[in-house]
């Protein structure tokens, strides 16, 4: 049976769906106007905090790198006319200030490593060790810089006469995928083993350079050292 067609009068009596929905929405908004206002304010506040944080973080980063560049430039200029210790004394306070204020930023983290290098150059080895160790966590995701710091810790411990710790850090540096860092670490490790009376381990370490790094700048020196040990 064909569906009965509604008359115009009947259609006019039926509520319009859109009007009904709109009316309900208006009623809902009216009833919960305060709650909606609070939610909207919270969203706006969150957005302001987020973008405000990014803005100030970027400003802080820019300031950190600017101050670092200025301090580094001052140090380089001083080094041309004075000793590493004298130059260190002139910039030490500035580096400490950058690290204290921007230590959590990339600029501050880089300042810590540079200050450690400057401390090492000024023969402030204990201070360099502390700074290098602090910098390890800053660059744990950057394997190249991380392994450079590990290697520098080996050198710093050598300078204070702690060959056990020096060997431990050079051993870690030998795991580097960077060929130059690895070769250098192996060479220093071999020398330390000899100084510690571990001749066999020293020879094994040197042999690794000859076997795996035939183009190493240490190749001829190592070959000569091994020939001397065999006599």
Predicted regions mapped to residue ranges:
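Short solvent-exposed coil/turn linkers within tandem alpha-helical repeat scaffolds
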Residues: 99-108, 122, 137-146, 173-182, ...
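N-terminal positive-inside, membrane-proximal cytosolic segments immediately preceding the first
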Residues: 2-42
